[in-house]
Curated annotation (Swiss-Prot):
Name of the featured protein: Probable transcriptional regulator ycf29
Modified residues (4-aspartylphosphate): D52
Gene symbol of the encoding locus: ycf29
Keyword NAD: no
TM segment ranges: none
Gene Ontology CC: cyanelle; cytosol; protein-DNA complex
Domain of life, per lineage: Eukaryota
Locations listed in the record: Plastid, Cyanelle
One annotated GO molecular function: transcription cis-regulatory region binding
Domain HTH luxR-type residues, every copy: 142-207
């Protein structure tokens, strides 16, 4: 369930918003001041804030500024409410980092559309970021690939990478050439390579040498 925090001193606004938003499936928390809002943020997971600009003490702009400076809440969606429809206020709001802006009195259905649009945008951004991070992780993982080699397989691989022939590897490890050939074949299978050149390249690219 999506959790929305309403920060507004107007009890009528809070009650009407809570009633409507709850009926359409949102969970709503209420706050009348910034300190109370911070307390709620620390205790509960909030997905979006609807915040009035004009409040006693710290106003909505300053609260938004604090949010954007906090690494835990810097991307938290915020919709600003105001009784003032001044262009300068909207400019300040957007520069400070609000996601949307609506003037009182407002149509609650319009606000819901704005809420859904903001949440959808943030969800898409989050999914793209997660995909990018996942791809980065997979790239790092592939560059540091771990394959379970037996001690003898690892020894053979190390010598293959050094450029030794099967006869030389056999002499070095005091085993027969036929046994070396079997180990090399196993290495091809485990690394999905087809020849010694591919095996060496694969081993070097994935840090498989010990």
């Amino acid at each position: 369930m999506i959790n929305i925090l309403i920060l507004d001193t107007d009890i009528g606004i809070r009650n009407s918003l809570k009633l409507y938003l709850t009926e359409i499936g949102f969970h709503v928390e209420e706050s009348t001041c910034v300190d109370q809002a911070w307390d709620i943020l620390k205790r509960k997971k909030i997905d979006l804030i609807i915040c009035d600009i004009i409040m006693p003490g710290m106003g909505g702009f300053n609260f938004l500024h604090q949010l954007r400076l906090n690494t835990d809440y810097c991307t938290l969606p915020v919709i600003l409410l105001t009784t003032r429809g001044l262009t300068q206020d909207r400019i300040i709001g957007y520069k400070t980092g609000c996601d949307s802006y609506i003037s009182k009195p407002f149509n609650i259905e319009e606000l819901v559309v704005i809420i859904e649009g903001v949440l959808n945008r943030h969800t898409l951004i989050r999914l793209k970021l997660e995909k990018k991070q996942k791809n980065s992780f997979l790239l790092i993982k592939s560059n540091n690939l771990k394959i379970n080699f037996t001690p003898r397989e690892q020894s053979v691989l190390n010598l293959v990478v050094e450029g030794l022939l099967n006869k030389q590897i056999a002499a070095n490890l005091n085993i027969s050439i036929r046994i070396v050939e079997k180990y090399v074949s196993r290495l091809f299978i485990k690394t999905k390579t087809r020849n010694r050149a591919e095996l060496v390249k694969y081993a070097l690219e994935n840090n498989l040498i010990t």
